């Protein structure tokens, strides 16, 4: 399943500008660089309008980067089309087709790759009648059909834009299980965006944090968590030379999230941050230095060795 | 459909546009049915009237008029069926897909956008060609069945198109123009409107310039003569001082032959001329027009395919600094 480079998705200095306006306006994504090793389940998190959907659409070959290059499964996104699954945020489906016709369309458009039993099982688990028209389905039911379409083509890379947004907790849990089973069984690389971090914790092993159109943080979640420490101590404690992501002083008490550059000063209480704390700290502090794309790339390389 | 073993992509196009296919099939069948009705029931009543009129001073021509008029209606529907194709192609075939994002659904299956557009154009083109060919053949048969009851000659605007392959050419061109406008505008309703307007404008322009599409015939006579039968009359007039002078409202000299001669001498009229297309020019005129329309269709198709990568394409071949 893995290609020669070992990366499912690579972005090199990718920028995408909408509209022809010059100046700062119009850039949805700027100077975006990262490498995602094959076989990972990657969470793309960031606030609304951060560029998550743009990034996924670039990877799916639906948008052309204004600058830089996107590499998917070792080739360009257009050539990788047959091996990539994509579920857009608004789950576009043909409203006048029935569920069964939609799946038959998937079989017709993905000759040789189509896994009909998988598609039928996912749909049947949601109690969807094959004769039901798509326009009669609820948002969550449409999501299920869209996921069935994307999974049954047996993609090597599965791109999901806010996949779980309109699912009830039960369906969310079940479909996440289906996704993880797929990833485990076929080594599928999954990239899913969300602005709900809790949704991704526990199922993802790689993180891509996007804010303001740039990559703020990229790497294995375990390594990212290990690289950061939550500290608390007296307010006058100097945190230099460590990288401070976020610090807050209440009275004489200091609490901060830092990326240690060496041994920590005496007298600080330390604890491990949760993924949500880490993400929120970066999002609350847009000026906090993130890991640079080069660092992220070298981290990813280390991870693949 | 499955019995025919249509390959996957065309089958999907057929499945997606089944309602349009049914409407188009019903339209073709209804028009052919109407022509059959006109040429069995209405025409026999008209012919009976005509036979009666041949031997009586006063007679009723209502059935004859009905037959002629309704045949013209059919010609109008056949000729302008391309407008319906244009509206559908702009709105339903491509425009709605781009607006609602379902085109992207297709492009993220194992189908490249170029193959998608090719199938989206080829399948409707085939069915449009079949339908229009059936309509043209039926109309030609009906038009020549009862010449005595006809309303209008081969030159009438809609009959001219409906009797030949220009009908097919206009429909194919409408399909291509619809796809092009939809790719340009990416919205259902604007694409519908612009596609319809562009197709209508093409009809309008070619109707205006039709007479110039093939060299006309000029006949010069010493005395004023009536027009030859079944010709497309373009211009007539007199030759005065060796120059042609067009007379739209009839001859400048009227009266008995002696009076006309006297008048002509006074005005120094040396002859009369008529400019027209004989009936034998129908096919040259018709085929040139069809060729122009097909050229526009080809141009629109090429532009649509060249525009498509700007709507969706990955990895521009750019070197990275």
Locate each region found by the language model:
Chain A
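Conserved structural motif at the start of ABC-family nucleotide-binding domains
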Residues: 9, 29-31
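The feature captures the beta-strand-to-loop junction immediately N-terminal to the Walker
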Residues: 45-47
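Helix-to-loop junction immediately C-terminal to a conserved catalytic motif
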Residues: 60
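Conserved ABC transporter NBD signature motif
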Residues: 67-80
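ABC-family P-loop ATPase nucleotide-binding domains
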Residues: 90-145
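Catalytic Walker B motif of ABC-type/P-loop ATPase nucleotide-binding domains
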Residues: 158-162, 167
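ABC transporter nucleotide-binding domain
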Residues: 173-258
